[in-house]
């Protein structure tokens, strides 16, 4: 197989062969790191599989590797030890091949499960993205604005995701030379500590904000039906907002099905632990299409919840956004208020109505003063990093 020859060109352009030689001089090992790394990368693209199977598959290449599996495993330990410097060197070498747009970077975390019940090293029990009862290892990833990976970190599966952002940002500044940057994250990584960290110097943040978690007076403002501006992503000078303000209740949802509306304001938040105050912009968007999507999804979940109640299989009630059991409530008393020996389950109409209030609405927080339409567009680019994980 000579397909790896096309990959070989990119491998050398990124200077990975020279990086390996530098590591060899430092550690004085007796095997060829360049051969092992190139073999692992080529087979990862051509024949994805385990390290052992990669070594076997590489025997199909015109240039076959001489390393054995024990040397491959020892090399992996060296690569792990030098990983920060390897990533920084690859980034700097990539700048010679083309422009890297690192003015806006996206960060997200995922985790990988192991078919084992024992915790060991990085493999720890934590919150699994797939809700599997297995130990997991966590991975954090930065991509640039174009979706090209910048840097990653590997952490134990029981580590809080919010604590992984700052250390990797520090590496970007110290080793990559990236300091003037806008960091985009989802709501799960948007702790106020992380926002404050990106609210200094030449750094800024854009993050998803759950409208269910903001103060009541801000919720009332966010869900008002009047004072909305239409977002135009195709403006003459880039994304822009309309001068006209709209009342959502007066609009034809079919005519404006693909439209996006926006409203914004500045808010102040004080951290209870330190007393520090953060001033940020709350940008709220509304979409009829998004509203209808949430309603349709909920209708199916309610139907599923009714089936569970009818079968008497409610069991432990759920809280997850995707769990239909969150719409089921449990009662252990009679209509007269007396304690009952038998538990009864029914639909939680109050929970359903509470969720319906937020249908179609979406929140973003930022400390940037740029056009709100531009902020919305930048935040929309977060799908790129999710694509990388797939």
Role assignments for model-derived ranges:
Residues 1-3, 13-390:
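Anion-binding and metal-coordination hotspots
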């Amino acid at each position: 197989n000579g397909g790896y020859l096309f990959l070989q060109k990119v491998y050398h352009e990124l200077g990975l062969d020279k990086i390996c030689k530098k590591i060899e001089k430092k550690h004085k090992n007796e095997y060829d790191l360049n051969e092992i790394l190139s073999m692992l990368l080529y087979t990862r693209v051509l024949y994805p599989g385990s390290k052992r199977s990669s070594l076997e598959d590489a025997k199909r290449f015109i240039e076959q590797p001489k390393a054995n599996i024990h040397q491959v495993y020892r090399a992996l330990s060296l690569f792990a030890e030098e990983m920060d410097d390897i990533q920084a060197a690859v980034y700097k070498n990539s700048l010679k091949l083309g422009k890297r747009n690192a003015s806006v970077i996206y960060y997200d975390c995922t985790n990988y499960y192991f078919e084992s019940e024992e915790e060991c090293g990085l493999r720890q029990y934590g919150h699994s993205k797939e809700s599997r009862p297995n130990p997991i290892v966590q991975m954090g990833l930065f991509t640039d604005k174009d979706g090209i990976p910048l840097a990653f970190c590997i952490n134990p599966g029981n580590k809080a995701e919010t604590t992984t952002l700052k250390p990797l940002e520090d590496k970007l500044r110290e080793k990559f030379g990236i300091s003037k940057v806008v960091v985009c994250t989802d709501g799960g990584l948007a702790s106020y500590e992380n926002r404050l960290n990106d609210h200094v110097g030449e750094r800024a943040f854009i993050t998803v904000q759950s409208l269910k978690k903001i103060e009541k007076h801000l919720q009332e403002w966010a869900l008002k039906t009047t004072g909305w501006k239409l977002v135009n992503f195709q403006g003459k000078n880039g994304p822009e907002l309309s001068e006209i303000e709209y009342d959502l209740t007066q609009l034809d949802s079919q005519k404006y099905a693909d439209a996006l509306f926006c409203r914004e304001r500045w808010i102040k938040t004080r951290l209870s632990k330190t007393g520090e105050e953060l001033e940020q912009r709350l940008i709220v968007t509304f979409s009829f299409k998004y509203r209808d999507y949430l309603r349709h999804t909920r209708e199916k979940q309610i139907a599923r919840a009714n089936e569970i109640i009818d079968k008497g299989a409610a069991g432990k009630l759920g809280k997850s956004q995707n769990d239909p059991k969150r719409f089921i409530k449990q009662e252990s008393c009679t209509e007269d208020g007396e304690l009952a020996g038998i538990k009864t389950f029914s639909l939680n109409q109050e929970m359903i109505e509470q969720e319906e209030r937020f249908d179609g609405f979406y929140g973003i927080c930022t400390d940037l003063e740029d056009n709100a339409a531009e902020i919305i567009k930048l935040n929309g680019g977060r799908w790129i990093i999710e694509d990388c994980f797939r």
